[in-house]
Amino acid sequence: MAYIISGIQQAGVGVENVEAAFKWYNEHLGMDIPVFDEAAEAALMLPYTGGKPQSRRAILAITTKGGGGFEIWQYTSRTPVKPTFKAEAGDLGIFIVKVKTDNVQATFDYLKSKQVKLLTNVSTAPSGKKHFYLEDPYGNIFEIVEFDDFFSTGRAQGGVAGAVVGVTNMDRAIAFYQQILGFDKVVFRTNEMQSDMHGVPGANHALERVLLTHSKKRVGPFSELLGRGEIELIAVRDRSPRKIYEGRFWGDPGFIHLCFDIRNMAALKTACEAAGHPFTVDGGAGFEMGEAAGHFTYIEDPDGTLIEFVETKKVPLLKKLGWYLDLRKRPAEKPLPKWMLRTMGLNRKKV
């Protein structure tokens, strides 16, 4: 059986204070359901943590509106190292995380009322979608993007819809994201200066922007919840890009990875090796993370940006009753019933 990508499960966000960050993302971006909250040792990420295990605390926060969540991650065995420079468009790594909304103006007005740092006004992207950019209190940039596929109603903003990634060789990067991750449709490709990014660091440089999405609807257990996704690639042409994580560890402040929910890790491993991007980390099939369990792996894109894959085995639906779902007993392509996923909303945490 071929591997299945159900969607973008989460974006990893390294922070200095996990509790404060969870509270901010809960209040401002609606990430109010903690799937797990765990303090443990990150013993398997040695290529990216200085060659030795590091202690950490992580909270996976999601919203039942639809879209991926945030894995909010803090070192506890060392002082998190902040970047020494302000990343700009085209720098290598995850520069921006995309968050979906069904009402761009309402989300803009809400965040403005909460005195969030808004980098742009609402404008139209080259894709034709309405969007705007903001910066959180920790220096991370988010793009709020208009989408029409949502799992439930309620507040306008949903979850993670994708990322903006800096690359050096556009054609090589496109091939990677198309071949392995299934983002086979080019929505736009432009070298022209775009006013929609005016206000975003580095937007005044000569940039090539490419937006990719997937032509086929995602399938799998969480596909209805995660919905459609997109990847925007940016290459800067009039300066030398820097690595956003140069001189720092994975888990230090910033966007540390983009994670995809998948089925059939063995088939994915074969495909990644054939494409020249073998797993750099393999957590094994019996890994547990708090109240969730699964198999996680990592690969690098052509410029070293970390992509995580998680094949979920067990997930808490209703913690108070000890109700957990074992996904190993379900067909790989079949979406979970909506009523079942909605029970996760009963784990909502007010701040």
Q: What would you call each of these model-derived segments?
A:
Residues 1-22, 32-38, 92-99, 146-174, ...:
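N-terminal beta-strand motif that seeds the catalytic metal site of vicinal oxygen chelate
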Residues 118, 123-125, 201-212, 234-246, ...:
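Intrinsic, low-complexity N-terminal interaction/targeting segments
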Residues 213, 218-219, 225-236, 250, ...:
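C-terminal functional regions that serve as terminal interaction/effector modules
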Residues 71-75, 127-153:
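Short, structured interface segments
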Residues 6-16, 54-77, 81-110, 130-134, ...:
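Vicinal oxygen chelate
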Residues 41-46, 79-84, 150-151, 193-197, ...:
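A short, acidic/glycine-rich surface segment
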Residues 13-67, 113, 123-125, 166-228, ...:
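Core segments of cupin and vicinal oxygen chelate
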